[in-house]
Regions:
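GNAT-family acyltransferases
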Residues: 1-86, 104, 108, 116, ...
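Conserved acetyl-CoA-binding loop-helix of GNAT-fold acetyltransferases
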Residues: 62, 82-83, 90-107, 122-131
Length: 154
């Protein structure tokens, strides 16, 4: 994944820089735990590979927060994110992978989804729209919160 994430253009909207091998190993070691120590969050991190070649092209991830009753699988919300390397963008891979993750999460009781997207990141906005997300008025760290479903006014 170091080579996949090496393209500096991937960080145009999110900030940061390509991770080193050591940074990526440390990140994955923390993520493989699968959730917070108190059980209030699940962490899913799926590598996206091409079906035709098996080549790694990016990832899709979810942070699932517990709902009002404290259970992750009931009344919970999943914050989603996706990254696809430059040469593989625009082919529907992020939409397909995100949709697959949402399907899996729904099968485990998650019904609400969000994503935080930079206002100028048209490609990520297209992925969100493909999943029936809509932009809200909420902004966090310069990114707009998108939510699944229909806006409250509809």
């Amino acid at each position: 994944m170091v080579a996949v994430l090496a393209d500096e253009a991937l960080y145009e909207f999110t900030g940061g820089e390509p991770p080193t091998l050591e940074q990526l190993q440390n990140r994955y070691a923390a993520q493989v735990v699968g959730g917070s120590a108190d059980g209030a969050e699940w962490w899913l991190n799926w590598m996206v590979t091409r079906r035709d070649s098996g080549a790694s092209v990016g990832f899709v991830q979810a942070t699932v927060r517990a709902g009002t009753n404290g259970s992750v699988a009931d009344d919970s919300v999943a914050d989603l994110a996706w990254v696809i390397s430059g040469p593989h963008q625009g082919q529907g891979l992020a939409s397909e992978a995100t949709g697959a993750m949402m399907l899996w999460l729904r099968s485990h009781g998650v019904t609400r989804f969000t994503a935080f997207i930079h206002p100028d990141h048209g490609a990520s906005q297209a992925v969100a729209r493909h999943q029936d997300f809509y932009p809200t008025d909420q902004v966090h760290d310069g990114e707009i919160r998108w939510e699944s479903g229909q806006p409250a006014s509809q």
